[in-house]
């Protein structure tokens, strides 16, 4: 009987939020640019589009398909010029951030939409686009582990964590961290029960066969090898930030 009551209470909560969101939908804008890391985008999208009342907008400079880092082309649902007012912006990362930092139209759109959004968010190196738009000034933030030393260049201080919240700003770590980040946002907006229900719906219960997904659990040898692999990308990002 107690279990039935709990289920009924949770269903009531979910239905109430759905009703409220139908009256006041939440417009969520995902920002695309060439060579974006697709999981930075698709991970949070898969979670946040399930949030009660969410209306997702996949936005780019033009309606043309946007190439991602893995060969998957992503089709925008709208353009920067035609975007509605956004309650939340989500800026993914990827090696394409380096070129996007030099694209005034992309940075200006992030700046303008972020200034009026209730939630300003990024995944991975998307943090540097928020920073270039002046949206990380004085904020605690995170990004992909290889790039955390560059955060002060865009006015932010690095804070440890899979994802970091500072006021209305949420930043996620690298790539897969965007899924955890999205559940954190959902819990803050809709409550823990809704986040738990969606987590079960997508069966998000990661159990990788290896345990080296964070620098704290990787060997010194592995860290040295991967740090070398990121030398050139980090240098390119530093140069792009410095202009």
Predicted regions located by residue number:
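Generic recognition of short, well-ordered alpha-helical interface segments
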Residues: 142, 146, 177-180, 193
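Catalytic cysteine-centered active loop of the rhodanese-like fold, especially the PTP/DSP P-loop
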Residues: 131-132, 167-168
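Structural detector of well-ordered beta-strand residues that form the stable sheet scaffold
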Residues: 120-121, 142, 159, 170
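Active-site-proximal catalytic alpha-helix in oxidoreductases
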Residues: 125-127, 170-186
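A conserved active-site-flanking secondary-structure segment within enzyme catalytic domains
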Residues: 136-163
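Extended, subdomain-level signal for the structured scaffold at the beginning of enzyme domains
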Residues: 2-120, 127-131, 148-150, 158-160, ...
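Thr-Gly-centered strand-to-loop micro-motif
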Residues: 76, 165-166, 172
């Amino acid at each position: 009987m107690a279990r039935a009551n709990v289920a009924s209470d949770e269903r009531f909560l979910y239905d109430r939020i759905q009703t409220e969101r139908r009256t006041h939908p939440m417009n969520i804008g995902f920002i695309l640019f060439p060579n974006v890391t697709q999981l930075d985008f698709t991970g949070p999208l898969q979670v946040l589009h399930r949030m009660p009342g969410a209306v997702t907008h996949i936005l780019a400079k033009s309606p043309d398909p946007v190439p991602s880092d893995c060969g998957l082309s992503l089709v925008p649902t709208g353009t920067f010029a035609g975007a509605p007012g956004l309650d939340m912006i989500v800026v993914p990362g990827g090696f394409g951030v380096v070129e996007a930092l030099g694209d005034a139209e992309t940075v200006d759109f992030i700046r303008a939409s972020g200034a009026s959004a209730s939630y300003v968010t990024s995944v991975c190196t998307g943090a540097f686009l928020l920073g270039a738009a002046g949206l990380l000034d004085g904020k605690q933030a995170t990004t992909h582990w290889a790039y955390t030393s560059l955060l002060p260049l865009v006015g932010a201080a690095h804070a440890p964590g899979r994802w970091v919240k500072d006021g209305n700003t949420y930043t996620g770590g690298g790539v897969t961290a965007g899924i955890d980040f999205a559940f954190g946002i959902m819990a803050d907006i809709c409550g823990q029960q809704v986040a738990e229900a969606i987590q079960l719906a997508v069966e998000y219960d990661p159990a990788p066969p290896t345990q080296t997904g964070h620098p704290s659990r990787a060997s010194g040898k592995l860290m040295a090898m991967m740090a070398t692999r990121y030398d050139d990308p980090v240098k390119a990002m530093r140069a792009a930030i410095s202009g």
